[in-house]
Amino acid sequence: MFNLPSAVEITINSLNSAGYEAYIVGGCVRDFLLQKTPFDYDIATSATPLETEKVFEGERIIETGLKHGTVTLIKNGMPLEITTYRIDGKYHDNRRPEDVTFTKSLEEDLARRDFTVNAMAYSKKTGVVDIFGGRSDLKNKIIRCVGNADRRFKEDALRIMRALRFASVLGFEIEKDTKKSIFDNRFLLKNISAERISSELSKLLCGENVKDVILEFSEVLEIVLPEIRGMKGFEQKNPHHIYDVLTHTAVATQNAPKETALRLAIFFHDCGKPDTFKLDEKGVGHFHGHPIKSCEKARCAMGRLKFDNATTDLVLTLVKYHDTAIEPIEKGVKKALNKYSPQVFFKLLDIKRADNSAKNPKYNNKSEIDLLEKLAKDILSNGECFSLKDLAVKGKDIINLGVPVGKEIGNCLDFLLRAVINNEVQNQKENLINFLKEKKLKQ
C-alpha cells in the first residue's frame, strides 16, 4: 500500500464520494513502486473538468488545460493536476493532440500514455492497476512503449528524449522494438521546441547511466546536439588519452557531479578538439586552443537550446578554463580564487576531476586537484586575502595619499592585491600604505 499525502487522499476520496473514479497515475505510481518519493502527483478521474470543479466548489482551482481535460486543485498548499480520462485525437505536429475525447474508461486513458512503466494507476480501493505490463517492465528494468512504438513517437516526438532520459536516470534498457523506433523516428525531434528539448536533455545528462546512453544513442542525440558528430570516433593520438573524443566525453560526463551546469560543461568541454587537431613530427596529436573553440561551439548550442543566461554563463566559463593550469601553491590558488570566485573555482575543480577520470590512468593528476582544493579551503577558512574586497585598504585610503580620483586608484589597489597574494607585504593597512608609498608612488 502506498503512503499517499493527505491532500492526495482527500482529493481522491472527495471524487469517489461524488460518484466518480479517481486514481493517481503515471510517474508517481512508477516512483512508489521503485520505492522513491514522487516529485508530484497526477490524478486521473472519470469526472469531466466541470464536474471536478463542482466537487471542489469554493476551493482554489486553476483551469490549466481545460481543452485537454486538466484542472489544477491547490489542496493544503499542494498543486494537484486532475485530468479527465481521455482519448487523444490526431497529432499533426509531433507535439500534442489537436483535440481530445473524454471517456469513462481508465483503460482507454492509460492506453494513450508513452511507456508501460508510466501507464499504471493506483487507488487504495483497487491497488495498482497495470494493464500493459508496466510492473513487470519495472522489475526487469525495461523501457517499452505502450502499444505501437512508431505511433507513440509520431504522436509526440519528445517521447524519444524521454525514453533516453529514463534509460539514463533509471539505468533501464530500452526494449528492441522501442529502440528501433527511436532510431527510425529520430528526425522528428527537429519539430520539438528548444525549451522542451533542453528540459529533457538536462535530466538525461544528470542520469546515473548517461555514458551508455550517449554512446549507444549518439545518432539520436546528434539531431539536437550536432556538436556530437565531429567527436564520434575521433581518435586523439595522444598518450594522455585512451578514448576517442566522444567516449572520453561520455565517461567524463558520467563522473561529474549531478548538477545541470556541470554536466553540460563537461559534455561540451572537448567538442572543439576535432577542429583544432594537429599531429606533430612524432605522430602525437595536439589540440592547442581547443577550450576556446569548444566554448564557441558551446555558446551556439546553449543559445540554440535556449538555456537561461546564468546557466549559459557558468557553462561557458567552465568550458573556457577547464584546461587552464592552476599552480598548486598558495599564491597560485589565491590568483585563481580572485579570477574565478570561490564558487566557480570549486566547480572548475569538479570539471578537472571528471576530465581527469576519463584520461590515461598513467597520467592521473588527482592528487594535484585534491591539493588545489585543500589549499583553497584553507585560504577561505583562514580568511586570507585574495580579492579587493579582502584588502585592508580601500579607494578612499589611496585618495587620502594624494592620488587623483580616477583610473590610478584602481591601479594602486590592484598593485597592492598582487603584492599581498605574492607575500610581498602583509594585508594590514599601515603596511600596505607604506608599501605603496615606497614601491609605487615614489616612481
Language-model-derived ranges and their functions:
Residues 1-443:
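Catalytic cores of the polymerase beta-like nucleotidyltransferase superfamily
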